[in-house]
């Protein structure tokens, strides 16, 4: 099956700023595990010192006053968002299939949606940029399997002002069952049948 790139319509508001999402406090992709810097090393080590997988202890109060103490609430909010439910959602109704994905950290020109072999692939990529801490680049790839029977050429996508990418496609309609038809049976009289057979057996010119 050939690869098809899906164009998406932009629903951005005029005031949208593609660089506003570089500030960690406004992150919406932290819980997706792509598009954000790592947590400080000591936080990663502290989270790993748990009794069993998946256990997370309450955040300790900051031990010192200063920049670190001010930054702690911001990281606490980010961590809380990471542990909450994800923002990638698949919805399917009787006649439509839809995927919603938060791509708030990526500009429209950095996003690509395409279909190939019954799979929708969404990719986003930031080229390497320099900030006050150094160089940073971001990228992600998400793949979703289309329901059976969906026409890849009917897949469409749109980008909302809040940075939510929606990819949807109509589902095939169920096959219409043929209506039952009763065929009437006609009966022929014996006399008609006998006369017809006699006429066929008599050859022309013979007596």
Swiss-Prot record:
<keyword id="KW-0346">Stress response</keyword>
<feature type="modified residue" description="Phosphoserine; by MAPKAPK2 and MAPKAPK3">
    <location>
        <position position="15"/>
    </location>
</feature>
<feature type="modified residue" description="Phosphoserine">
    <location>
        <position position="13"/>
    </location>
</feature>
<keyword id="KW-0488">Methylation</keyword>
<feature type="region of interest" description="Interaction with TGFB1I1">
    <location>
        <begin position="72"/>
        <end position="207"/>
    </location>
</feature>
<keyword id="KW-0539">Nucleus</keyword>
<dbReference type="GO" id="GO:0001932">
    <property type="term" value="P:regulation of protein phosphorylation"/>
</dbReference>
<dbReference type="GO" id="GO:0061077">
    <property type="term" value="P:chaperone-mediated protein folding"/>
</dbReference>
<dbReference type="InterPro" id="IPR002068">
    <property type="entry name" value="A-crystallin/Hsp20_dom"/>
</dbReference>
<dbReference type="InterPro" id="IPR008978">
    <property type="entry name" value="HSP20-like_chaperone"/>
</dbReference>
<feature type="domain" description="sHSP">
    <location>
        <begin position="78"/>
        <end position="186"/>
    </location>
</feature>
<dbReference type="GO" id="GO:0044183">
    <property type="term" value="F:protein folding chaperone"/>
</dbReference>
<comment type="function">
    <text>Small heat shock protein which functions as a molecular chaperone probably maintaining denatured proteins in a folding-competent state. Plays a role in stress resistance and actin organization. Through its molecular chaperone activity may regulate numerous biological processes including the phosphorylation and the axonal transport of neurofilament proteins.</text>
</comment>
<feature type="modified residue" description="Phosphothreonine">
    <location>
        <position position="176"/>
    </location>
</feature>
<dbReference type="GO" id="GO:0042803">
    <property type="term" value="F:protein homodimerization activity"/>
</dbReference>
<keyword id="KW-0963">Cytoplasm</keyword>
<feature type="modified residue" description="Phosphoserine">
    <location>
        <position position="88"/>
    </location>
</feature>
<feature type="modified residue" description="Phosphoserine">
    <location>
        <position position="100"/>
    </location>
</feature>
<comment type="subunit">
    <text>Homooligomer. Homodimer; becomes monomeric upon activation. Heterooligomer; with HSPB6. Associates with alpha- and beta-tubulin. Interacts with TGFB1I1. Interacts with CRYAB. Interacts with HSPB8. Interacts with HSPBAP1.</text>
</comment>
<keyword id="KW-0206">Cytoskeleton</keyword>
<dbReference type="GO" id="GO:0005737">
    <property type="term" value="C:cytoplasm"/>
</dbReference>
<dbReference type="GO" id="GO:0042026">
    <property type="term" value="P:protein refolding"/>
</dbReference>
<feature type="modified residue" description="N6-acetyllysine">
    <location>
        <position position="125"/>
    </location>
</feature>
<dbReference type="GO" id="GO:0005634">
    <property type="term" value="C:nucleus"/>
</dbReference>
<dbReference type="GO" id="GO:0009408">
    <property type="term" value="P:response to heat"/>
</dbReference>
<dbReference type="GO" id="GO:0051082">
    <property type="term" value="F:unfolded protein binding"/>
</dbReference>
<keyword id="KW-0007">Acetylation</keyword>
<feature type="modified residue" description="Phosphoserine; by MAPKAPK2, MAPKAPK3 and MAPKAPK5">
    <location>
        <position position="80"/>
    </location>
</feature>
<dbReference type="Pfam" id="PF00011">
    <property type="entry name" value="HSP20"/>
</dbReference>
<keyword id="KW-0597">Phosphoprotein</keyword>
<feature type="compositionally biased region" description="Polar residues">
    <location>
        <begin position="153"/>
        <end position="163"/>
    </location>
</feature>
<dbReference type="GO" id="GO:0042802">
    <property type="term" value="F:identical protein binding"/>
</dbReference>
<feature type="modified residue" description="Phosphoserine">
    <location>
        <position position="27"/>
    </location>
</feature>
<feature type="modified residue" description="Phosphoserine">
    <location>
        <position position="85"/>
    </location>
</feature>
<dbReference type="InterPro" id="IPR037876">
    <property type="entry name" value="ACD_HspB1"/>
</dbReference>
<feature type="modified residue" description="Phosphoserine; by MAPKAPK2, MAPKAPK3 and MAPKAPK5">
    <location>
        <position position="84"/>
    </location>
</feature>
<feature type="modified residue" description="Phosphoserine">
    <location>
        <position position="201"/>
    </location>
</feature>
<keyword id="KW-0143">Chaperone</keyword>
<dbReference type="GO" id="GO:0099641">
    <property type="term" value="P:anterograde axonal protein transport"/>
</dbReference>
<dbReference type="GO" id="GO:0005819">
    <property type="term" value="C:spindle"/>
</dbReference>
<feature type="modified residue" description="Omega-N-methylarginine">
    <location>
        <position position="12"/>
    </location>
</feature>
<dbReference type="InterPro" id="IPR001436">
    <property type="entry name" value="Alpha-crystallin/sHSP_animal"/>
</dbReference>
